[in-house]
Amino acid sequence: PHHTMAQKIKNIKLYKNDLPLNVTFKGSIAIDTETMGLNINNDRLCLVQISDKEGNSHIVQFIKDCYDAPNLRKILEDKNILKIFHYARFDIAVIKKNLGIMCESIYCTKIASKLARTFTDRHGLKDLCKDLLKIDINKQNQTSDWGHDSLTESQLEYAANDVIYLHEIKNKLDKIIKREGKEYLAQACFKFLPTRAEFDLLGWQEKDIFQHK
């Protein structure tokens, strides 16, 4: 099956292997991925979740070795659409490894939080939802078999939760970043992310090329 809508619960739509042509986005989207594990070179991409500003979630489920997704790739490469991630470094590396393209126009809420909220070391998505939005999200499906052919309703809701709050989090963080005069630093970090992801794919995750040693 190819990009047929398999399920729809609440504002969540699930497709197989690609987005359909009639799903389009403008301005900005929130994106996350789910993989078999956390090794970007060995653990395959299972899901790509996309949410628009209205909180509608579109989830693309990849059957193993079926990564020909021209509609999704076109959106990810579109420089006119801002992609909001939480920990973009991992997601864009996984997308490059599996879909063969590098995302353009990137924003990372984890980096933004580290720049804006220097008074805390709590920069996880659950922390940002709780601290900035007063929302307690459920992370019980964080370790889950995302490669299974049929996903549970709770898995789909978990996957959607990873993207539906990112627009609002970005808006909150941007206000602090602007107030503290760190906009140029944030933009420089976001622009460097594709390069950082390329280093990770080369096996340099733990190596800092800027260090003296």
Predicted regions: what they are:
Residues 5-127:
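Conserved RNase H-like, two-metal-ion catalytic cores of nucleic-acid enzymes
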Residues 51, 79, 115-116, 132, ...:
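Generic structural signal for hydrophobic core residues of well-folded globular domains
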Residues 93, 126-130, 164-171:
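A broadly conserved amphipathic alpha-helix scaffold signal in soluble, globular proteins
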Residues 102-103, 111, 133, 142, ...:
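Glycine-rich, flexible loop/turn motifs
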Residues 123-137:
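A polyampholytic, Gly/Pro-enriched intrinsically disordered region
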Residues 136-198:
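Acidic, Mg2+-coordinating catalytic module of metal-dependent nucleases/exonucleases
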Residues 198-213:
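Acidic, Ser/Thr-rich low-complexity intrinsically disordered segments
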